[in-house]
């Protein structure tokens, strides 16, 4: 099926006229501001069409959001496509290969709308989502652990040099 057949593709718009608030504004680089007006609520997949076209964003069910002018968002037909599955699918598609510009990367709405996507049964989609989300949680845990190890390494290294500056050898562990 084509993307335009699995859901509605809606355009983002400029957010500068709105006041500060709690609704996240998504642009091609991610969340750039929070305003007082929601454009829609999740589930939705936000797809940048100018700038960082390789990054897609998922908005969870019931979460209000505002889609900025450099993006479009897709509201999936619930009887056809799980929005989280579409998010993972688009992440694997490497949308940057559809780049239509030599300067600022851009993805035409028409190319996105006409892109063919794999649409398995909903039960299969939900199983894939559970598996991929579980893997992403595990990866995040590993990244957090590596960050902690890096912080410990930095502190230990600094301590070693402080002791060496004072003419003492660090204690062996």
Predicted ranges, named:
Residues 1-27, 114, 119-173:
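Non-catalytic DNA-recognition/assembly elements of restriction-modification systems
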Residues 11, 94-97:
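Structural motif corresponding to the C-terminal cap of alpha-helices
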Residues 27-91, 100-103, 108-112:
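A short beta-sheet element
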Residues 79, 83-86, 96, 128-129, ...:
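Short, charged, low-complexity patches
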Residues 88-95, 134:
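Short, intrinsically disordered, mixed-charge
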């Amino acid at each position: 099926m084509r993307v335009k057949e699995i859901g509605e593709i809606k355009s983002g718009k400029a957010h500068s006229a709105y006041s500060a608030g709690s609704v996240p504004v998504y642009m091609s680089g991610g969340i750039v501001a929070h305003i007082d007006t929601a454009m829609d609520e999740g589930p939705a997949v936000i797809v940048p069409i100018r700038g960082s076209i390789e990054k897609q964003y998922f908005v969870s069910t019931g979460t209000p959001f505002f889609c900025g002018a450099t993006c479009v968002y897709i509201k999936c037909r619930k009887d056809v496509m799980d929005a989280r599955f579409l998010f993972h699918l688009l992440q694997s598609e490497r949308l940057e290969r559809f780049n239509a510009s030599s300067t600022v990367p851009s993805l035409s709405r028409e190319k996105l709308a006409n892109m063919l996507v794999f649409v398995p049964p909903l039960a299969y989609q939900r199983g894939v989502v559970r598996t991929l989300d579980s893997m992403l949680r595990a990866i995040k845990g590993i990244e957090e652990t590596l960050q902690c190890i890096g912080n410990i390494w930095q502190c230990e290294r600094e301590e070693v040099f402080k002791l060496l500056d004072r003419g003492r050898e660090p204690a062996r562990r």
